[in-house]
Amino acid sequence: MSPNSKGVEILSIGTELLLGNIINTNAQWISEQLSQLGLNHFRQSTVGDNCDRIVKVIQEISKRSNLLITTGGLGPTPDDLTTEAIAKSFNVNLFERPHLWDEIKQKLPNSKLQDDSSSLRKQCLFPKNAQIINNPRGTAPGMIWEPIEGFTILTFPGVPSEMKTMWEETACDFIKTKFSDNYSFFSNTLKFAGIGESSVAEKINDLLNLKNPTVAPYANLGEVKLRITARAKNHLEAKNIIQPVKEKLKKDFSKFIFGENDDTLPSVLIRELTERNQTIVFAESCTGGLLSSSLTSISGSSKVFKGSVVSYSNELKNSLLNISEEKLTKYGAVSEEVCESMAINAKEKLGADWAIAISGIAGPKGGSQDKPVGLVYISISGPNNHITNIKKLFNSTRNRVEIQTLSVNVCLNSLRLILLSNSK
């Protein structure tokens, strides 16, 4: 867009979005597409299925933006009001496009459509000069329309698969031709584990003020992301802008950065073990198979992951992992001593290079003064009788799933660090 442009806005229409019944993935996806096109996307709005409210929002947006992209409200039901509201916003009439009705009838050949099927025919109504965006996956077309000079509206249905196809086949080229200035945004995301967002932010304070590239931290459960974004004409130019910042971060946070972009802790660990031609097994208690699932969700995990024992009860710890009743009684299932034995015995019984065992109290019940909710023991048994024991005490205000997920992340990252240390 030109330097004098006002920017782009996204308007998501649907009461179900306001009620939280569905997640608005459309706005996220469109935002990514706009960034790739280098467009200034400043605001997103959501409004329910109420014509007057939709009209008010559209009229407000038309005063401050060049391009409005709407999703939702194009279907045949009474609460699909987007096109009607757009027409009302600019005091114009809607006209039927007969060829669209013919297309709808062809898409629904087995239904008993009548020429007076007004609920479906409303999808054929558009302002006089609007350009139709064909919907090959559904019955609700969209439109490209410039109701006033300098302001364009693109409408899409709320079904993600339909919206994406219409965007890729029609809308993207239109937006690129009319609004893009040949600059695009390119991003590279570094992923951190074993360090909190505040600690990262404190150490990169100088980088947070950069204009091109920009550096922005984001936190997920047990993980921090740093997104480095450059505005450039092509990937090579962007890479040259991003690279110095990326190299500085890798130097300053060498052991904490585990990957980039689509990397995950499970995928990185699988890659590291594959490169070493090593295998791994698990002995899980408090995570109940979540650790195993984190690996098996990744394609190619069978090269390194042999299996696991989910020994939730003391009986199974005894019968499957040979943890003596005396040890269980003396130290308790949630203890370093028992967890270490679980790892050693799992490695021996299941025949792998590495074994990770985990035992803890995920809550919300079951804790005590000596062993509170959030207490987790992790043991890693490796080649040459290598043993690493880890004790973590997660905040007891976290819920059960959060404690389990954080525990899995610690397991994976701890072995990653061991492998990294061994390779030096």
UniProtKB/Swiss-Prot annotation:
InterPro entries the record matches: CinA, CinA-like_C, CinA_C, CinA_KH, Competence-induced_CinA, MoaB/Mog-like_dom_sf, MoaB/Mog_dom
SMART domains, per the entry: MoCF_biosynth (SM00852)
Domain of life: Bacteria
CDD domains: cinA
Pfam families assigned to the protein according to its UniProt record, in alphabetical order: CinA (PF02464), CinA_KH (PF18146), MoCF_biosynth (PF00994)
Gene3D superfamilies: 3.30.70.2860, CinA-like (3.90.950.20), MoaB/Mog-like domain (3.40.980.10)
Family listed: Belongs to the CinA family.
Record-given protein name: CinA-like protein
